[in-house]
């Protein structure tokens, strides 16, 4: 049986191997054709595998790494001192063809810089963007990018993000002629920073992009657009704010009806409502769409939330599997030359 092999930065994230190792076992249990290379401290990793199913361990290999890139390290310094780190070795496994994709919950800036340096961007792409696919109110999906890879973006980068997001929505999500919008502080054409207005001018005159104009942050989950484009600073703040509100909403649902002074029938009604609402809105749980693809590279790199729990990191692993199976870089590369506006 041919296995799909992924490299995991087992030491990255807020909880390191205490999350990545059990998440890896969960992913292996759910996918019999998956093999994982766990990069990190062998002693720490193996101590967490003592009670693991021996059959799962046959598809798991520990790759030693002496060092870890700290989550608060400056990207430039982290990249210079990256030799021997779990993140860099995981990326090297992809570069050398030993793994089909890399998954890391580590330092976003360092991951971006190392991936660009080692795996290289596709032709026509200046800088990769972090992209995720989130559910919306129309029971459909919305592609959102950039989510933090590039804090500052010029108009050219925003246009490139729009192209990549459009290709992703059509080729991978399966949306015909996807609508593309720029995230802005208003829908009027005069609103926004110069780079946003300049990008809008280009997208309006790009016939292969179904550009619909500006949308605001409160439109992110409405389904008004299939692709939402913004710079990494705005995207990161927007996504995390949205996730925080959703988590609060779900936690309030969970705690409702649990008061000690309530009668049994009120508690029963409360629990019934919880199940109904959870079924209706459970798909919005951020854990279910953890894992942002570093879009625009020649290989596949998935960035998990640093604070991801076991369930969420397992979802990020599954995101990597799907990206490999759907040949995301190849599909984007195949359409970039025809779609991307030519630069002077």
Swiss-Prot record:
One Pfam family, short name: FA_synthesis
Subunit structure: Homodimer. Probably interacts with PlsY.
Taxonomic lineage: Bacteria, Pseudomonadati, Pseudomonadota, Gammaproteobacteria, Enterobacterales
GO terms under biological process: fatty acid biosynthetic process; phospholipid biosynthetic process
Role noted for this protein: Catalyzes the reversible formation of acyl-phosphate (acyl-PO(4)) from acyl-[acyl-carrier-protein] (acyl-ACP). This enzyme utilizes acyl-ACP as fatty acyl donor, but not acyl-CoA.
Record's catalysed reaction(s): a fatty acyl-[ACP] + phosphate = an acyl phosphate + holo-[ACP]
Stretch forming the signal peptide: none
Enzyme Commission number(s): 2.3.1.274
Name used for this protein in its record: Phosphate acyltransferase
């Amino acid at each position: 049986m041919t296995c799909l092999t992924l490299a995991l930065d087992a030491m990255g994230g807020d909880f390191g191997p205490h999350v990545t190792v059990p998440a890896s076992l969960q992913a292996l249990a759910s996918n019999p054709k998956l093999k994982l290379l766990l990069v990190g401290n062998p002693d720490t990793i193996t101590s967490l595998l003592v009670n693991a199913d021996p059959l799962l361990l046959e598809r798991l290999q520990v790759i030693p790494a002496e060092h870890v890139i700290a989550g608060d390290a400056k990207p430039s310094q982290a990249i210079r001192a990256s030799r021997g780190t779990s993140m860099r070795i995981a990326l090297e496994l992809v570069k050398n063809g030993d793994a089909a994709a890399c998954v890391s919950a580590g330092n976003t800036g360092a991951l971006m810089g190392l991936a660009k340096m080692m795996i290289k961007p596709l032709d026509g792409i200046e800088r990769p963007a972090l992209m995720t696919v989130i559910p919306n109110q129309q029971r459909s999906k919305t592609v959102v990018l950039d989510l933090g890879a590039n804090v500052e973006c010029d108009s050219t980068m925003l246009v490139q993000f729009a192209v990549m997001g459009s290709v992703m929505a059509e080729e991978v999500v399966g949306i015909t002629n996807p609508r593309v919008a720029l995230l802005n502080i208003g829908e009027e054409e005069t609103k926004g920073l110069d780079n946003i207005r300049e990008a809008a001018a280009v997208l309006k005159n790009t016939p292969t992009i179904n550009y619909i104009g500006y949308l605001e942050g409160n439109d992110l989950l409405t389904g008004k657009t299939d692709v939402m484009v913004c710079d990494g600073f705005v995207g990161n703040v927007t996504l995390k704010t949205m996730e925080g509100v959703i988590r609060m909403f779900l936690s309030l649902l969970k705690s409702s009806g649990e008061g000690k002074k309530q009668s049994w029938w009120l508690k029963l009604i409360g629990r019934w409502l919880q199940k109904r609402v959870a079924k209706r809105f459970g798909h919005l749980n951020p854990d279910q769409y953890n894992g942002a693809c570093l879009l625009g590279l020649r290989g596949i790199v998935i960035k998990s939330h640093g604070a991801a729990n076991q369930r969420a990191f397992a979802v990020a692993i599954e995101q990597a599997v799907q990206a490999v199976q759907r040949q995301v870089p190849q599909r984007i590369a195949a359409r970039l030359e025809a779609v991307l506006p030519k630069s002077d």
